[in-house]
A protein has these predicted regions:
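Membrane-proximal cytosolic interface modules of multi-pass membrane proteins
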Residues: 8, 265-268, 311-320, 342-394, ...
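Classical protein tyrosine phosphatase
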Residues: 216-240, 471-504, 508, 521-534, ...
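Acidic, divalent-cation-chelating loop motifs in proteins
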Residues: 28-30, 78-80
Length: 694
């Protein structure tokens, strides 16, 4: 926070003299000291075409935005009707625009790195552990289990004289890999269970220990480990133990292990045995499954990818039968596979049943060029409760009976849920074609729904004040939670969504400011709740497909600010675009385009959002410090109304889903601010939570 109490996003360093001169030099080509207005207008259109090449309804140059409107906007910010403006006069006008300097963004990026370097070893370790610790602990559990069973078998067969005398080095390699394969396949199959993850996610601490957001990455990684161990296991038998066991000079040792009826035992007999055939067929199918799971195959035909995964059922069956002969030890693999296989099999049978026998009536509607909206009623026979932030698997029989795709539940009011779907893939593009052209009118379709899975951040509802920091698509579940909270608030307090009369005298002007402004503490209702929502993306395109959701929140916030005497739900949306533009002209015009909002089109021409867009990396140290000072003011108001609140702890939840370096900074800052709350007696506590979604 600035020394004068300004918010971090208002405490900016404006364009330096060098940057202003560089911008003017780009306009003053002939060096005559005059800036041609037509050149300014041309440059504005050129930069807009570079930044927003596919105009959407909110863009500056859409069909309904007249040339006169653009001309008036340019004349207004330039502040002159001259066609040729003196360079010095134009320079002063550029400075009056108060555009942030490019250097400040670079300094913020450097500050984030130096902040962590300046931390002491203990503080750095605590911050690192807060972000990565539970995930590391889980991976350590998986690896230690693999090592434990692998080493157990290694020692057993290496020290067993009769094993190596009969089957040589191959049995040691094969059985060591087999020992490691038991827990590997257990975790591999278990990572495919959606019902288990949904159930366990109800526990915050288990969700911290097991990063469900990385379940797909974990599944791919452990599959690679499994196919490697399985290959080494096969090599150990095919080129080692089978060769040694079929030799005449080793028949005595083989007879002592397998019995006198087991010899003579030629190589082909080992191959044709139950362990040999089941192992080879299972390994071959495993290779086929891996090939059909390659990114190239998945991208070209998702249906082939999903059908390929059906091979896992014969693979698991063969693996369960693989050790039932009990040649060297009692059967073990089947016990490891029984529970996870039963879970996954139950889920898949349920999905097939839902896809073929239970169709859900739904509507689909085009929102913009990148997004469609699917609405459906929750079937009454579903036992799972639907919540915003969860996800469901969606099937559309008109497109495919076998393709199921996961989508986040945007909102869930009553018995109706909504899905906002970005149509940037093959299947989603075909889904868009089911709509009634580009008219925006809803079209009736039938869908299959499997879910819900995952869970919203359960502890989010434990805090009256929360800070949400998300990067890219990771913030999607929280955007759904925000919309859900806002619609419930509208319903409880007769907001715009209830259909109550609105004051329409100046709604556009109000909306142009976007988001919710600061309110005086005395106007807060007893059930006041505040959420600071910081969404960081690399480029503006990432903001477009969620703009409809966030704008619904912004509109409601503006409506309540104007009509309600007391604030009940206060959502403050801050969107940050971090993409760097080294060209000063691009930077300036990007800022001007963001400023261009009219009563007819109050949204940003670049992002489609009502709330102001901030360019550059957010300084979360200043943001959290500013938030702390505001919480002190709010706590003082509570104490003034009720003195007993003085000794009460005031908890703020900080939910993070993004890059680790930002998470470490937030974790460290939360500890420092909590310590500050103890020192100054405010007893404000910041609880850092690394959120995962899957």
């Amino acid at each position: 926070m600035g020394d004068d109490g300004t918010a971090p996003w208002e405490d900016v360093q404006h364009l330096t003299d060098d940057e202003v001169n560089a911008f003017l030099s780009d306009l003053d080509h002939n060096g005559d000291g005059l800036i041609d207005y037509s050149e300014v207008e041309k440059k504005l259109d050129q930069v807009h075409a570079e930044i927003a090449p596919n105009p959407s309804p909110h863009n500056l140059n859409h069909s309904s935005a007249s040339d006169a409107d653009r001309h008036a906007f340019l004349r207004k910010i330039i502040g002159s009707d001259k066609n040729r403006i003196p360079r010095d006069e134009f320079a002063e006008r550029v400075r009056s625009w108060k555009i942030p300097s490019l250097k400040q963004d670079k300094e913020t990026s450097v500050d984030q790195k130096t902040y962590l370097r300046k931390l002491g070893v203990l503080r750095r370790m605590r911050s690192y552990w807060a972000v990565h610790g539970p995930e590391i602990a889980f991976l350590a559990l998986v690896v230690s289990t693999q090592l434990a069973f692998g080493i157990w078998h290694l020692v057993k067969y290496l020290r067993g004289e009769y094993y190596t005398r009969a089957f040589g080095w191959g049995v040691v390699l094969a059985k060591t890999c087999a020992g490691a394969l038991y827990p590997t396949f257990f975790f591999l199959v278990l990572s495919m269970s959606r019902y288990l993850s949904t159930f366990l996610r109800r526990s915050y601490y288990i969700s911290r220990f097991i990063n469900w957001d990385m379940s797909q990455t974990f599944h791919i990684a452990i599959s690679c480990v499994a196919v490697t161990l399985a290959t080494l296991h096969a090599i150990g038998h095919l080129s080692g133990s089978f060769v040694w066991g079929s030799r005449v000079e080793n028949e005595g040792a083989v007879a002592m292990l397998l019995g006198p009826d087991a010899v003579p035992r030629p190589y082909i007999v080992y191959i044709r045995s139950l362990p040999g055939l089941t192992g080879l067929v299972a390994l071959g199918l495993f290779y086929v499954l891996c090939l059909l799971s390659l990114p190239q195959v998945r991208k070209k035909s998702y249906e082939v990818f999903q059908l390929g995964h059906l091979l896992m059922y014969p693979i698991l069956g063969l693996l369960m039968a693989h050790g039932t002969a009990g040649l060297l030890q009692a059967p073990m693999f089947g016990y490891w596979l029984a529970f996870p296989t039963l879970l996954v099999l139950t889920e898949r049978v349920a999905r097939v049943f839902l896809g073929f026998s239970q169709r859900v009536p739904a509507t689909i509607q085009i929102l913009d060029k990148e997004t469609v909206l699917v609405k459906a009623a929750i079937p009454s026979e579903r036992i799972w409760q639907y919540h915003a932030g969860q996800y469901v698997f969606l099937q559309v029989p008109k497109l495919s009976y076998f393709q199921w795709h996961p989508f986040t539940v945007s909102t869930c009011i009553g018995n109706e849920f909504q899905l906002h779907i970005k149509t940037d893939g093959n299947w989603t593009s075909r889904l868009r074609e089911l709509c009634n052209g580009e008219s925006g009118a809803p079209s009736a379709i039938e869908i299959g729904v499997n879910g819900p899975f995952g869970a919203p951040a359960q502890r989010f509802y434990d805090f009256s004040h929360s800070i949400v920091v998300g990067a890219g698509i990771g913030v999607t579940p929280f955007s759904g939670i925000l919309v859900d909270l806002q619609e419930k608030d509208d319903k409880e307090h007769e907001g715009p969504a209830t259909g109550k009369a609105k004051d329409t005298t100046e709604p556009r002007e109000t909306l142009m400011h976007g988001g919710s402004g600061d309110r005086h503490p005395s106007t807060y209702a007893p059930d006041y709740r505040r959420i600071d929502f910081h969404w960081t993306v690399r480029e503006r395109n990432s903001l477009l497909w969620l703009s409809d959701l966030l704008n619904r929140v912004s509109r409601s916030q503006q409506w309540h600010a104007k009509h309600d005497e007391q604030a009940h739900l206060d959502v403050r949306i801050h969107t940050h675009i971090t993409q760097k533009h080294n060209k000063i002209a691009t930077h300036v015009y990007r800022w001007l385009l963001e400023m261009h909002r009219t009563p007819e089109h109050p949204t940003s021409p670049l992002t489609g959002l009502l709330n102001p867009t901030l360019f550059g990396r957010p300084d979360f140290v200043k943001i959290l410090d500013h938030h702390y000072e505001e919480m002190k003011v709010y706590k003082a108001v509570l104490v003034e109304k009720d003195p007993e609140q003085l000794d009460e702890e005031f908890k703020v939840g900080v939910f993070f889903c993004g890059t680790p370096v930002v998470g470490e900074i937030l974790a460290d800052r939360c500890r420092l601010l909590s310590a500050r709350g103890i020192e100054d007696g405010s007893k404000i506590e910041y609880h850092f939570m690394m959120e995962v979604f899957g």
